[in-house]
Amino acid sequence: MKNEKKFNTALNLFILVGMLVAVVVTNVFKVQQPGARHFMLLLASVGAFTGVINTVLSANGNIWTFLFGVIDVSVATVVAFDSSIRTGGEPVWGNFALHAFYFLPMQFVGWWQWRKHGADSHKKVNARRLDSRQWLMMLSGMLIGITAGYIVLCKVAGFDISGTFRYLILFDAIVFVLNVLGQILMSFAFMEQWYVWILVNVFSIFLWSEKAMSSAESSYTVVMVIKYSFYLLNSLNGLRIWYALSRDS
């Protein structure tokens, strides 16, 4: 037990430091871009830092994840709103609406649900597992969501859906739907959320790797690959911890 606690502490510290370094380096690249708005970058950095803490606490079943989640999502909402005002782009407004009316309320739902399942400032949440009916509902919803998301993104991008299969747009749709699904499973304390977050990070690594091979800003994209690699490691750690938490429950 003592050795396991030391291992968990060391692994969490490694993941936390790795994520934070990746965030810092990412923002260094952004500051150097022409027309960079330093205040908004600083605000986004605060959100990114709290987001890192949020994910590590979530992996450990700590209810304070939602406090940092509220800060992270609130900052992301402000940044998305600012981008929408400046660009007027429909996808950006969609990002604002997603954060303001979905991810932000789900932080409070998560706090309430985790409290119902035994979590407090000293105790980890009593994690749950999906039953067969819930698995079927989740997979059906995921398939419908990805299909609808792919069609919408193709329309927004001006592509013919019946034309060449556009796998990068499909991956964008998959990541979007998995993020929505993962938040639901997280807020309701289901262990299976970590399967979803693992997929999110794997697809994100693939997408950024693809950009790294085709973009002139290869240094920035490589940093993003490293960043999501740490997120993937955190997801694997979360699966390990939550598997035990749900078994104990």
Locate predicted features.
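Alpha-helical transmembrane segments in multipass membrane proteins, preferentially the mid-helix core
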Residues: T147-D160, A173-E192
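N-terminal membrane topogenic signal
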Residues: M1-V17, S132-M137
